[in-house]
Structure formats: C-alpha cells, structure tokens
Regions:
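Glycine-rich, aromatic-lined ligand/substrate-binding cores of catalytic
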Residues: 748-780
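C-terminal beta-barrel architecture of Gram-negative outer-membrane proteins
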Residues: 733, 767-827
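Conserved small-residue
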Residues: 158-193, 421, 620, 637-747, ...
Length: 898
C-alpha cells in the first residue's frame, strides 16, 4: 500500500495527471474525429429502441457484434447476471466489462437500474488498443454510457411511462391427475391418490404486472444548465411473491465561466431497489413440475401441507411460496469534474467521485420446508473514493495534427459485511425479524468481513495524423494494486494502432458511390485481477472449531491455503484488423473486424505435492487461453424520404475460444492442473449414484464442452422398459461412465455464431421496430428430458406426458439428450404513433405498444434454447429441469415533452 501511494504522489507532481474515466471519454471522442485507428461502436439515440423498455440492458441487447447480454434463464426481472464482450478470457473471474456512467466507475447492477429515457448513447470498447486506457479494469471490455444533460434551451419537462402485463404461454407438460393415476395402474405401481387434479404451475404463477414512470426537468442557458430526473418501477412477476421495485433519482448540472475556459460538471445519482423473492426459486419450478398432481394446491383440513415422503428432493410448491429471500440495495454516487483551458490547445482537468452502496439480505425458511427452519440476515456496505487529474494537448500545423494526454488516478475501495444464520425456529410468525428467538446457530454462521483494496495508475497517450489520412496512436498505462504481491505490484500495459482513411486518397476521391473507406489495425495488452481478492496473496487463517482450554471455550484457528508471494496480473494481448465502408452517402455501411487475443499468466488453482506444500492446491500464474473471431456489422437505409424511412441494422459475430494450457514451472517445479475438469452436472431425483457430469473444462478445447458417453439407441432391459445403449468407446469390454472412461467430446456449450438485428420502418407519424437475436453452433444438454422421461422416478415424482410411452428406465447421461441449440428469437416488436402537435406548450406526444419475447424459431425440443450459454458456471449449456416458465410481456407506453 505504501508503494502504491508513493507512486501516486510522485507521478502526480511529475505528470500533472489525468482523469482516466470522464476525461478519457471526452478526450478520446475528440481524437476519434481525426483518427481512423479506433474501432469503437456507438449506439446513438437514433439506434436506441423506442417504446416500452424496462431497463438499459434492453437497449443494449443485440445492438453490437460480440456483446452478449445474459439474463437469469428467461427471467427478465431487470436483474442481470452478466455481459460478455468477446467471450470468456479468464477462468478465475474478471470477465465482466468495466461500466463507465458519465465518467464514474460503475457496475452492471447499477447499469440495469438506469432508465432508457435517461440514456444519450452507449460506446463499446472491445480491443486492447482502446481498453488499454482503462488498464486492468478494462481487460474484458468497456461499456461507456452517456446520459442526457441539460440543453440550455430553456425549461423543459418530459414524461415517459408504460404499463404492461406478463402472461405465461409455455411450461412443462407433465401428467395431470387422471393420467398419473392411469399410468400408475397400468404399470401395477403403488401410488398415493390425494383425490385432486392440480396443475402446480398454476399454483405458483399469476399474471404479472409492471408499470414504470420517468419524469425529467431540464433548463438553463448556454453557460449554465441542469437536468433532474426521477424514475419508479413496480414489477410483480409471473411467479407469486416475486416482486421488484426500483426508485431512481438523478441530477446533473453544468456551469461555464471565464468565457468558457472553465467548465464544471456536477452529478448525483442514487437508487433504491427492493426484491421480494423466495429462498430457492429453482426448487419451486422443480417441485411444481415433479409434484404428485393428485395432491391439493393448499393445506389439508388441519392446516398442514401434504408431503410425499418418498419424494425427498422436492417440497410442496405452495409451501415453498412462504419462503422469503428479500433484499434491498441502496446506491448513491456523486461526482465533480473541472476542465480548465489553460491555453487554446492545453486543457487541465480534475475529477473526483464518491460512491456508497448498501445491500441488505434477509432469508427465511419455515419449519414446514426445513425441519428446524432457517433464518439469515446480512448487510454489506461499500465505499469508493476516486480522484484523478489530466493534462491534454492538441495542435495542428500544416498537414499534421497531434493529440497528447498524460495523467494519473487513484481508486480506494472499502468493503464491509456482517451476517448471521440461525436454526431452531420457535415460531414461524417471526419470519426473519427475531433471530434471538432461535435455539441453534451453526458454527461459522455468524461472521463479518472487511477489505480495502486500492489502485493507483499513470497513463499517457499520443495520437498523430497526417493529412487526415494516416493516423497512429500509442498509449501506455501503468497500474499498481494493493491486491497483488509486493514482488509484482505494478503492471504496465502498452497499445499501438494504425489507421488509413483510404477515401481521401486521390485514386478514390472521385469515386462518388464510395462515401467512406477506412482501414485500421492495432495491438495492445491489458491486465486482469478479477480472480483474486485483498487476501489472496496473504497467509490467512480461519476458525477451525471450539475447544476447552482451562475450562474456557476457545476458538481455534488454522491456515486455509498455500500462499504465493509471486502472484501477478493476468495479461491479455490482443491483435485486431478491420475496416469501415460506407456506400451511397452511407446508406449502406459495412464494418468488419478480425481479432485474436491470448491470455497468459492465467490465474488458476494448480495441484501441488504434500508435504512439500501444506495444502494440495496453489494459486499461480501459469495457464493460457486464446480467443479469436470475426465481427461483421451492416447498416442499410433502403428507403429515405420525407414521409417514409426504413433502417435495417444487422450484426454477426463468430468466436472461437481455446484453453491452451494449465501447466508450467513454479520456482523450478513443474506443476499442473487436471486436463479434464467437470464444470456442470445433473442432480436431483433420478440422478443419484451415477456419473452425471455433463460439461467439462478440457485443455485444448473451448471452455465448456460436452464430454459424454455415446448412445447408439435404446435397448430393452430387465425392468420391462428401455435403457440407453452405450457404446464401448475404448474397446475394453466394459461400459465406464466415469471421467476418462467411455466418453468423447460431443460439442461445445457456447455459441460459435451470434446475430442481432434491429429493423425499423416509419410512415409519416407511425413507426414500427423489431429486434431479433440469435445464436448458432452450440449444443444444449436436455437434462429436463432426461430427468422427466426417466420412469424409474415414477410415481414418487411426476413425469412428462410422453414418458410412459417411451418407457425409458435409465438415469445415465449420454449424448441421447444432447441437441442443437440454434435459435432465432424475436425479442420484441414496438409500434408507435407520434401525434402531430399544434400546441406551443406540448412539443411532442408519442403513444406506443409492444410485445416482448414474441416467438422463437428453433429445433430444440426443450422448453427454450435461451438458457445460460455464455457464462462459465455449473449451469452452462444444461437445461436442468428448473427453467423459468416462458412468458410474454404486453405493454403500452406514453411519452410527452413540454
């Protein structure tokens, strides 16, 4: 920490420093106007989808090649899981892009709270030649968001609101009560007949309702302006007791002084979100599908939930609705930026921001779900202190133009947490509000946490252009982190890029149909620390248990891992080459880019010998991974008239990932990790006692491949049904389901190709827009089909309607249930009408209507192909019988401006 602070102080006085977030945004935009080296993607107001949209992520989805927005299955609750920019580049973490909102460092959760009506534009940085300006924080891409500010046109008021409802249109087709009874009797099986015919999907779902309102005020003059906005959302989802509320307040003010030489920018953003959910939503869907349909929807005459003691993996769906998993998040950030034009071509900028966040979580499981019940309360707080200054210079002489920036920044974070868990509930009436009324607190269930990492950085960049045709840009950033070992505190990340504006050459200047042609290439390096925390490099201890010492209970402590004093930054090197082509006054625009990136010094837990080491795992920088791909963007304006216009935007991305190595040298010792490691597997009823691993991490393959036995078909078994006929792949005369046995690489879980398309058409005051997304080249393991077609679980658990006819009595995984995951999904269609206004008071009035999740074109036989196909986790590529029911959202919107 001392070295980091000393470096910051020295560089502050030497370099005069830089605002690497807000000022990098502003300065880079100015450089882009004279440089052809950049491959930035801008999503501007005319491209932002109009109509009923829930959050900023709806705006971003499908708009940029290689950018994948992944939500929680099909649960579009406005709570995001992740965004991936050009795939996964690290095993241990740090794969989410850096989010910059008006120059302030943010995260994806905060981005999901911003109202589309507040957004001016998105800018997406993918290559290391652009992200190098953000150093280690931008290793996985950068998403810059500019929000709307005051225009100086006088006082204005705008309102944007929409109302909508959600309707479930597809869920698993399980046996109903009469079918369940008939099947059990036909097979001669004993079963419990509760006397009802209950559709448990109807028990746990409802018609969802959503409404949101956004009000904005702006005003001022050319030298002083402001904009304030307020937003509110109330969302009752299709799952009962699952609700979401969000309140947002935003204020921005800009002041100019000294004839415009001094510009001050002040901003405040705050939100409060509340989520009311149950403890295990996935268990709820599982139980609703597998529950005996002859059981009642509610309690019996004595007020007790009817349970099937033979079905230990599920619970009564109605009982699960009384679980609670409530959370409340409050976030407040403020920033102040000053920009002073010392000379006409010399600008000094300073920026500071403060962020405070608080997240509280409370969980409750009643005694009719867990025998002793369970309660949990936790609160986590965070503070970010961010400051930086910059000095930028630009000059033009003759045919030359030069832009240069030097600067430094400092980021200090503080994270604290406190939580308690207890069992032995006295009464369910207290819920989670009286933990003192419990009789048991599990060891380790009560604890706290603290960390305060810091990051100091220096940076410099130069861009030179000649005759506005040839450009070269170079940048160097150094980051020093308190989380890295003292031996490797600092990392330095250079980049260089070249650009050529071919259209301005003499041999093309008279070619009228070509409006623009630019070529570009670049190389850059960036660092990543996403896989470590403040304590990873330290010899840390934790409590082992309680013993009696001299009659007093004493907590014993012990080390928890091997320490590595040489941990350092992961390094990602990227090369890219691309072009931008505009034809016929840019009514047809093509952009394409080829890239290759390689992650080296990759953090991972490697196998080490004991007793040479105290533990059998050591985190070290040894592995490597590559990503390569091609991106294509097409924009067409086939119709452009006063009363009629049509725009078609299409993007496509091909990507190939490969895990190159998980072995190497550490202090003269060769260490390695397993070449074959399971990532995802099936569990639950019918998956007990088998080798049920499905998705693997295998060296030499993409992250997340299916490594499965090969099924030749079905064969009759001694149980009177059918089993999977598994091929003896290693010809040893036995069928071995274990890892390394009779298995083969059957495909990958992540798409090779993704597409996105936005089509809009306007006729006079009417317009219609449609968003289409798709993915191809990957596979999905239909674990839902395997589990609910397995008749060995019946009648303890319900099965699919087609299961009795197939009569498969087998739980083993194989490629029998591996299917193509290709799909094209119509994300939404919006129809709008801009009412012609004659009133001076009302400037514009727009009505809109929209349908989300309209239709999916796919050959996949399961509920939906839109599962987790991007994030490397235990759900990657697996449809695991716990999928959220499919629903559509129908919305009406109103926008008015005074």
């Amino acid at each position: 920490m001392g070295r980091v602070s000393l470096c910051l102080v020295i560089m502050f006085f030497i370099c005069s420093a830089q605002k690497i977030d807000a000022q990098v945004q502003n300065i880079r935009e100015k450089q882009d106007t004279i440089s052809a080296t950049k491959s930035l993607e801008h999503i501007r107001p005319e491209n932002i989808k109009k109509g009923p949209l829930n959050n900023a992520l709806d705006v971003l989805s499908g708009q940029s090649a290689g950018v994948n927005v992944t939500t929680n299955g099909t649960d579009r609750l406005a709570m995001l899981n992740s965004i991936r920019v050009r795939g996964t580049t690290s095993i241990m973490g740090g794969n989410d892009p850096l989010v910059i909102i008006d120059g302030v460092t943010s995260d994806i959760a905060t981005l999901s709270t911003i109202y589309p009506a507040d957004i001016e534009s998105f800018t997406i940085l993918k290559n290391a030649t652009e992200t190098a300006m953000y150093g280690s924080r931008g290793a996985s891409g950068v998403i810059e968001i500019k929000t709307k500010k005051g225009t100086g046109r006088g006082f204005e008021i705008s309102y944007d609101g929409n109302y909508g409802f959600e309707s479930m249109y597809k869920h698993l087709q399980m046996l109903n009560g009469p079918e369940y009874i008939a099947t059990a009797e036909a097979l001669g099986l004993d079963y419990n007949n509760g006397g009802y015919n209950t559709n448990f999907h109807d028990v746990i779902t409802r018609t969802g309702l959503i409404h949101q309102h956004h009000l904005a005020f702006s005003g001022g003059s050319e030298n002083s302006n402001y904009r304030a906005s307020f937003g509110f959302m109330d969302h009752n989802t299709i799952v009962k007791v699952n609700d979401y509320r969000n309140l947002v307040v935003k204020l921005d003010a800009t002041q100019k002084a000294f004839d415009g030489r001094l510009v001050g920018d002040f901003g405040v953003y705050g939100y409060s979100s509340k989520i009311h959910d149950i403890f295990d939503t996935r268990m709820l869907f599982y139980s609703a599908a597998a529950q005996n349909p002859t059981y009642p929807a509610g309690t019996d005459v004595n007020g007790n939930w009817v349970k099937n003691s033979a079905a230990s993996h599920i619970n009564h769906p109605g009982a699960l609705l009384y679980e609670k998993n409530d959370s409340e998040e409050r976030n407040f950030n403020t920033h102040l930026g000053l920009k002073f034009n010392i000379l006409d071509n010399l600008i000094l900028s300073a920026f500071g921001s403060y962020l405070y966040s608080s997240t509280g979580n409370a969980q409750f499981c009643p005694t009719w779900v867990w025998a002793q019940g369970n309660v949990y309360r936790g609160e986590f707080k965070g503070e970010d202190y961010f400051t930086n200054v910059s000095l930028s210079y630009n000059n033009a002489w003759g045919d030359s133009h030069l832009d240069a920036v030097v600067g430094a920044e400092y980021l200090k974070q503080v994270r604290t947490g406190l939580w308690v868990q207890a069992k032995g509930i006295t009464t369910n009436d207290f819920s989670y509000n009286n933990i003192g009324a419990t009789s048991s607190r599990p060891f380790g269930g009560t604890s706290s946490s603290y960390e305060d990492p810091s990051l100091a950085s220096i940076m410099g960049s130069v861009t030179y252009s000649y005759k506005d045709r040839y450009s070269i840009a170079a940048a160097l950033r150094g980051d020093g982190s308190s989380m890295v070992s003292d031996n490797n505190t600092f990392g330095f990340f250079p980049s260089v890029s070249l650009g050529w504006d071919v259209k301005k050459e003499g041999f093309l200047s008279d070619t009228d149909f070509i409006t623009m042609l630019k070529l570009r290439t670049g190389y850059g390096r960036s660092g990543n620390l996403g896989g470590i925390t403040s304590y990873t490099t330290l010899n840390t201890v934790k409590e082992n248990g309680i013993v009696s010492i001299n009659g007093a209970p004493t907590v014993t402590m012990g080390s928890i891992r091997n320490t590595n004093p040489d941990l350092k930054w992961e390094t990602r090197s990227t090369f890219n080459i691309g072009f931008d082509l505009g034809i016929w006054d840019n009514r047809l625009m093509l952009t394409s880019e080829l890239y290759y990136s390689k992650t080296t010094d990759m953090l991972y837990e490697y196998d080490v010998p004991v007793p040479t080491f105290a533990f059998d795992k050591l985190m070290a920088n040894i592995g490597s991974m590559s990503n390569q791909g091609v991106e294509l963007g097409i924009s067409v304006v086939p119709i452009q008239r006063k009363d009629m216009e049509m725009n078609i935007n299409f993007n496509m991305s091909y990507q190939k990932n490969k895990l190159l190595s998980l072995s190497g040298e550490y202090n003269g010792m060769h260490i390695t990790a397993s070449d074959i490691t399971p990532i995802g597997s099936l569990y639950g009823a019918g998956q007990n006692g088998g080798d049920n691993n499905v998705v693997y991490q295998i060296v030499g393959q993409p992250l997340g491949v299916f490594y499965l036995p090969h099924c030749k078909g079905l064969k009759e078994n001694e149980l009177g049904g059918y089993s999977y006929d598994i091929e003896d792949l290693n010809d040893d005369g036995e069928i071995d389901f274990s890892d390394g046995g009779d298995r083969y690489i059957a495909g990958q879980a992540t798409p090779k190709v993704t597409i996105g398309s936005n089509i809009s058409f306007r006729y006079k005051s009417f317009d219609i827009a449609m968003q289409i997304n798709g993915a191809f080249g990957h596979k999905i393991f239909n674990g839902t089909g395997l589990a609910y077609t397995n008749m060995s679980i019946f009648p303890d658990y319900n099965v699919l309607k087609g299961a009795p006819e197939k009569n498969i009595i087998d739980q083993n995984v194989s490629d029998y249930w591996l299917e193509k995951g290709d799909y094209v999904n119509i994300e939404h269609i919006t129809i709008g009408y801009n009412i012609p206004m004659k009133s001076k008071a009302v400037k514009s009035l727009r009505l809109s209507a929209g349908i989300s999740n309209l239709a999916t074109i796919t050959g996949y036989s399961g509920l939906t192909p839109m599962i987790n196909s991007y994030v490397v986790s235990n759900t990657l590529g697996i449809d695991d019988k716990r999928t959220y029911p499919l629903y559509r959202t129908y919305s009406l919107g109103l926008s008015i401006q005074f």
